[in-house]
């Protein structure tokens, strides 16, 4: 609670300073939900730090101030088991709060590294977490009480209107990880999930179209690297 109190004081002070400099300036207030370990000199995500971020989001909602936080940032060594649990915890907590903008997706190793596979896996997490966040409608139109009464016990709902309408979207289908039975997984060569993710990521990168300003953007980046690091390119 003390950390949250100090955080609110810092954020609101920043708001006052920004409006003093330029009245009406647009601003987002928020935090990176991390602790800093003085022994290792590293920051890291933690359930408590993410909880403080959620509380910060609720306070920004109370003040009617736009909020930003992270969703899918992790402390793993790339896209690994360490990162996966943090991505889920970070994303779901933000969606269950009053979170707004969520930059900083897919970083690892103290935000010094980004692996393309992290973006693809985070997309999976965000897609599923949004379904939890959106919930479902519990009303007469969606509860299908009339159909249940009409069909009666011991019969099939396969040809009922609600089934025909929703059977393609009634449950989540991953765009990355197939639902293998043990037999099909063995027939596929027993691939590790990380290998499947890597292949999907490579396919996406190979099929992605470069933006119109790609050549100009890359040229500027290479020129900056040459000036800073001389003959590295």
Where are these regions (language model features)?
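Helix-rich catalytic cores of soluble enzyme domains
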Residues: 1-96, 100
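Residue-level preference for alpha-helix termini and adjacent loops
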Residues: 3-4, 16, 35, 108, ...
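Long, contiguous hydrophobic alpha-helical segments, chiefly transmembrane helices and signal peptides
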Residues: 12, 67-72, 88, 93, ...
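A glycine-rich phosphate-binding loop feature that marks nucleotide/adenosyl-phosphate handling sites
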Residues: 31-38, 70-79, 108-113, 144-153, ...
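Short acidic (Asp/Glu) and glycine-rich catalytic loops that position anionic groups and cofactors
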Residues: 33-36, 67-71, 102-112, 175-182, ...
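Metal-ion/cofactor- or nucleotide/acyl-coenzyme-handling active-site neighborhoods
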Residues: 79-91, 96, 111-137
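Catalytic-core signal marking the mid-to-C-terminal active-site face
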Residues: 117-233
């Amino acid at each position: 609670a003390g950390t949250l109190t100090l955080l609110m004081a810092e954020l609101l002070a920043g708001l006052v300073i920004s409006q003093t400099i330029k009245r009406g300036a647009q601003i987002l207030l928020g935090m990176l939900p991390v602790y800093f370990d003085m022994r290792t000199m590293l920051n890291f995500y933690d359930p408590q730090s993410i909880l403080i971020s959620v509380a910060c989001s609720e306070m920004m909602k109370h003040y009617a101030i736009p909020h930003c936080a992270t969703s899918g940032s992790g402390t793993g060594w790339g896209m690994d088991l360490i990162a996966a649990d943090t991505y889920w915890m970070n994303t779901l907590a933000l969606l269950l709060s009053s979170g707004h903008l969520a930059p900083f997706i897919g970083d690892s190793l103290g935000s010094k590294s980004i692996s393309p596979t992290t973006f693809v896996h985070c997309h999976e997490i965000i897609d599923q977490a949004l379904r939890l966040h959106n919930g479902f409608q519990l009303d007469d139109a969606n509860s299908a009480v009339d159909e249940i009464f009409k069909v009666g016990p011991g019969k099939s709902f396969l040809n009922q209107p609600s089934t025909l309408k929703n059977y393609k979207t009634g449950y989540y289908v991953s765009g990355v990880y197939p639902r293998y039975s043990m037999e099909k997984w063995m027939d596929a060569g027993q691939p590790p999930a990380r290998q499947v993710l890597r292949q999907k990521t490579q396919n996406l990168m190979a099929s992605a179209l470069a933006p119109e300003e790609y050549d100009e953007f890359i040229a500027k980046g290479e020129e900056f690297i040459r000036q800073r690091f001389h003959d590295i390119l």
